[in-house]
Amino acid sequence: MIQPQTHLNVADNSGARELMCIRVIGASNRRYAHIGDVIVAVIKEAVPNTPLERSEVIRAVIVRTRKELKRDNGMIIRYDDNAAVVIDQEGNPKGTRIFGAIARELRQLNFTKIVSLAPEVL
């Protein structure tokens, strides 16, 4: 579960290293974000000499959470970290590579470009 003020790792090569969630996109009073949800975040740490800079406000989609995800078939998936992928307004990733495993639920939510770049889909 991701809520405002939560720090997340960045799972792509867009230039950002760490994000902080400042808003969960959805209903006006939505508190938590789960895998596949879009958030508004601020960059807390960035790689030098890249297009993204520190304190820049961006959109990101959650790809991994430490909170377990229960599927309809009873399988429970839990990751080691909270991670997100930086996206543009159309939902396309800004980076060209994705690091680490991502959940299969992203394909059902029309993030097919992110799924195709991922090395492992669980």
Swiss-Prot record:
The keyword Lyase does not apply. It comes from the Eukaryota. The keyword Plastid applies. One of its GO terms (cellular component) is chloroplast. One of its GO terms (molecular function) is large ribosomal subunit rRNA binding. It is found in: Plastid, Chloroplast. GO terms for biological process: translation. Keywords: Chloroplast, Plastid, Ribonucleoprotein, Ribosomal protein, RNA-binding, rRNA-binding. SUPFAM superfamilies: Ribosomal protein L14. Binds to 23S rRNA. Belongs to the universal ribosomal protein uL14 family. Part of the 50S ribosomal subunit. This is Large ribosomal subunit protein uL14c. It comes from Gossypium hirsutum (Upland cotton). The gene is rpl14.
